[in-house]
Design a protein with these regions (language model features):
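N-terminal active-site segment of His-dependent metallophosphoesterases
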Residues: 1-55
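Hydrophobic beta-strand anchors of alpha/beta hydrolase catalytic cores
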Residues: 3, 39, 109, 160-161
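Active-site glycine-centered loops adjacent to acidic/histidine catalytic or metal-binding residues
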Residues: 8, 43-44, 77-78, 165, ...
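Short acidic, glycine-rich surface-loop motifs adjacent to enzyme active sites
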Residues: 41, 45-46, 151-171
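Extended active-site neighborhood of metal-dependent phosphoesterases/phosphodiesterases
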Residues: 51-151, 179-195, 209-246, 255-260
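Histidine-centered catalytic micro-motifs
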Residues: 162-167, 198-206
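Binuclear metal-dependent phosphoesterase catalytic core
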Residues: 206-308
Length: 308
């Protein structure tokens, strides 16, 4: 079976460059051409609220994706609920809950949600940007959700693909990721390849790693790389139109992947792009590598891997 996946589109006209209707159409047309059974994103799809875009435009963008003639699915990222209440986002995204699963052509896709802060022993979901107040407490997966994942994997009679915004593989990923990895290893000992692949977005990086017999795919942003220290080399007139342009390295194309699953063989067909005006992170006052030692690239790599 084959599906299309992208991440971190960051639709916010006038704030970010990229994440446009044209980008969405590009992803859709490639999915149609490749025969993808569905399209899914790994979070940070759209920024709502008046500070980003009028409600009607924000909702229209979401509905454009929802109403494609290929099934579409959402996964929550940290920014999806920055300016729109969680309950409203779930309604607009047509999600049954913050976590859910579906089966497609012999595989189970499990969308889980580590968008929680752990504060005084309580797991508090991200909502209206609350996590900005407690950054050290973010990126936790509640134990109840780990148990839900265990049950959903145990009940599957097929390989499972796990998708979330934050990472189970990166050292700067989900805080209690080892508990989840231990659970995955337990399930794979009981039933080989119970969990075949784990996909995350969020970090705007491109990396593939096999960890304990599971393929972990750190999926790049479809739109840009974020830089903390602004770059002052963009044209002034563009910066006046796109507020956070100086804080981004823009990709010229909506990079994403089409993934084919055949038994335990995973084929990732990525794509290469380039950066707007040829501007790279090395031209700015920002470190070239991130906390996991990964460079920014305007690319989603391609690979064919059989897990044994």
């Amino acid at each position: 079976m084959k599906f299309s996946i992208f991440s971190d589109l960051h639709y916010a006209p006038g704030v970010f460059d990229g994440g446009t209707y044209e980008d969405l159409d590009f992803i859709y047309k490639r999915a149609k051409k490749e025969g993808s059974s569905f399209i899914i994103h790994a979070g940070d799809f759209a920024h709502g609220g008046d500070v980003y875009s009028p409600d009607d435009d924000y909702e229209n963008f979401i509905n454009t994706y929802n109403n494609l003639d290929i099934p579409t699915y959402h996964c929550l990222g940290n920014h999806d609920t920055d300016n729109v209440p969680l309950e409203k986002v779930l309604e607009l995204y047509k999600m049954p809950d913050v976590h859910y699963f579906f089966d497609c052509e012999g595989y189970r896709f499990i969308i889980y949600d580590p968008n929680y802060c752990l504060i005084d022993g309580e797991y508090v979901h991200y909502d209206m940007g609350n996590y900005f107040k407690t950054p050290e407490a973010r990126d936790w997966l509640p134990p109840s959700q780990i148990e839900w994942m265990r049950k959903v994997i145990e009940e599957a009679n097929c390989p499972c693909i796990l998708i979330s915004h934050a990472s189970l593989e990166r050292p700067d990923g989900i805080k209690n990721r080892q508990s989840v990895l231990d659970m995955i290893n337990e399930q794979n000992k009981k039933r080989p390849h119970a969990v075949l692949m784990v996909i995350n977005g969020h970090y705007h990086r491109d990396n593939i790693r096999i960890l304990d017999g599971v393929l972990h795919f750190d999926l790049n942003s479809a739109s840009f790389d974020w830089i903390g220290k602004p770059y002052n080399g963009y044209p002034k007139e563009l910066c006046e139109k796109i507020r956070l342009l100086p804080n981004t390295i823009i990709y010229n194309d909506p990079i994403h992947a089409v993934i084919t699953l055949e038994g335990t063989t995973i084929t990732i067909e990525g794509m290469k792009s380039s950066t707007f005006m040829g501007i790279g992170r090395e031209m700015t006052e920002n470190p070239y590598y991130d906390e996991a030692g990964r460079p920014v690239t305007a690319e989603v790599q391609s690979a064919k891997i059989t897990l044994h």
